């Protein structure tokens, strides 16, 4: 995988706007990340299977200026979040760096178990209902990029942020931005972000298609996608440079669906485009929260880069010219 990434960098095959890091990013067209409180009966039918979500920010080693991790709408209340009865939820944001923050195997799994909070805790804050931060930004930092875990594989430093419900049963909808500024969203050149399990809110309109982009490395022969609580809200379609549009199994209310399919040679070293297409009839599903992950044939989780490696994959039509006999 390291070789593939280095080749892509050398050839300039990353997207032209590989800068900064809004999460979700523009090309994903996802309105919000989603995490529920997880208190009481730990009800999962609202669309969150484990009440915890981890994201990783990757900063190239040549970038040495201070960075900030900003959270939009970090509180639980107001007009953006999803109420369940009355606002009673607490949400904790924790940022980790140092040895093991990314490299510990538990940090790269889907469930918040064992040593998933690996690394050195750099900052943490818990929010409840807070009108000041409703539809506003809270900023963690500054952090020296060297405080993240250095990885030779990516030749950069990685920070981990875990957002986790600490009681209550309301839904927290939020976004991140990795910035060079405390009070503005200013890009960190060359940065990227990724997760291994994406928990997010779907749009409430059928004309918006959301995307996630798992990267296929050179050891991948097949992948298995797992999605949770899709509510039969349309289709999940997979597109690549050689895959025109393959639909995969989708889940119903409060359950999982999975499907495995083979990887085509031309997809190695590229990203897949998982497209989330809402149904229009007999009605549009509102406030749909979903969870998805993808594993390779070795059982390893694939990274969902918010800025897809190699760019957004586009199907390449194979136009063949056939000579007509006279």
Residue ranges and their predicted role:
Residues 63, 71-75, 165, 227:
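A mature extracytoplasmic/lumenal domain signature
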Residues 21-32, 55, 83-87, 91-101, ...:
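C-terminal edge strands of extracellular/lumenal beta-sandwich accessory domains
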Residues 41-52, 199-204:
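Extracellular beta-rich ligand/substrate-recognition surface
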Residues 41-45, 109-154, 249, 256-274:
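Extended, solvent-exposed segments with strong compositional bias
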């Amino acid at each position: 995988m390291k070789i593939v990434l280095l080749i892509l960098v050398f050839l300039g095959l990353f997207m032209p706007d590989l800068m900064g890091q809004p999460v979700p990013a523009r090309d994903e067209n996802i309105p919000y990340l989603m995490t529920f409180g997880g208190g009481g009966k730990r009800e999962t039918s609202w669309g969150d299977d484990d009440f915890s979500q981890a994201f990783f920010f990757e900063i190239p080693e040549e970038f040495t200026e201070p960075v900030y991790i900003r959270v939009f709408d970090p509180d639980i209340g107001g007009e953006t979040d999803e109420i369940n009865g009355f606002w009673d939820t607490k949400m904790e944001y924790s940022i980790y760096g140092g040895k093991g923050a990314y490299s510990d195997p538990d940090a790269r799994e889907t469930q918040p178990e064992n040593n998933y909070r690996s690394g050195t805790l750099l900052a943490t804050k818990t929010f409840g209902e807070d009108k000041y931060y409703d539809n506003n930004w809270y900023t963690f930092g500054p952090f020296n990029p060297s405080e993240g875990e250095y990885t030779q594989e990516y030749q950069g430093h990685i920070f981990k942020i875990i957002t986790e419900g600490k009681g209550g049963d309301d839904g927290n909808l939020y976004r991140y931005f990795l910035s060079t500024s405390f009070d503005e969203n200013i890009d960190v050149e060359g940065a990227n972000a990724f997760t291994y399990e994406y928990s997010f809110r779907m749009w409430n309109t059928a004309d918006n298609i959301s995307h996630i982009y798992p990267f296929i490395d050179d050891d991948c022969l097949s992948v298995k996608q797992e999605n949770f609580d899709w509510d039969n809200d349309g289709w999940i379609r997979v597109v690549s440079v050689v895959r025109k549009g393959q639909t995969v199994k989708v889940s119903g209310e409060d359950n999982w669906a999975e499907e495995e399919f083979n990887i085509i040679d031309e997809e190695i070293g590229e990203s897949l485009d998982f497209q989330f297409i809402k149904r229009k009839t007999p009605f549009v599903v509102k406030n749909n929260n979903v969870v998805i992950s993808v594993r390779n044939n070795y059982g390893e989780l694939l990274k969902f880069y918010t800025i897809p490696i190699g760019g957004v994959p586009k199907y390449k039509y194979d136009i063949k010219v056939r000579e007509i006999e006279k």
